[in-house]
Amino acid sequence: MIKLTQILTEVPSVDAKVCLTMVQRTKSRLRIVLEDGQDAGLLLPRGHILHHGSLLSTDDGFVVEVVAAKEQVSTARSDNPTLFAKGCYHLGNRHVPLQVEAGWCRYQHDYVLDEMLIGLGLQVTVENEAFQPEAGAYGGTTGGHSHGDAYDDSLEKASHEHAHGHPHKHEH
């Protein structure tokens, strides 16, 4: 299994790509399958959120580019800036991850939120699109706390298997 352990800022070339949903891009430990079918695992520093175009690397320099997967989202639109701001305010007040662009915003589909925004006067469309929420005011990490990132220690255990093929017990 390919073990992706580093987040890079730039590289001369990419060796593979992986398509991940927004929820998958919040995980630091996750088994994944690259677009070419190779098994891989994320063993990344905690607290980082991956974005479309993020670059990951193994310890030996194999580079993987992250592609934001299309997923079911709701897109709310309004030509009225005040109405649009109110809709974004109410979503933010509910701590909804939100992608904000000129005249529209996008969030993971939730019919209750859709109805709330329609009630405010926004137009809401359910779509299958890539979702790239705002990183937040603190620089794109989770701010040092978890939002349900279930820890998968099987990947960490796998990272302790060395070249001679058997696992060791390591104290942490």
Curated annotation (Swiss-Prot):
What is this protein's function per UniProt? Involved in urease metallocenter assembly. Binds nickel. Probably functions as a nickel donor during metallocenter assembly.
* Similarity comment: family membership: Belongs to the UreE family.
Q: Which NCBIfam families match?
A: PRK13261.1-1
Q: Where in the cell is it found?
A: Cytoplasm
- Its primary localisation, in coarse terms, equals cytoplasm
**UniProt GO BP:** protein folding; protein-containing complex assembly; urea metabolic process
Report a single Gene Ontology molecular function.
nickel cation binding
- Stored HAMAP family: UreE
Q: Quote the protein name from its UniProt record.
A: Urease accessory protein UreE
Q: Which UniProt keywords apply?
A: Chaperone, Cytoplasm, Nickel
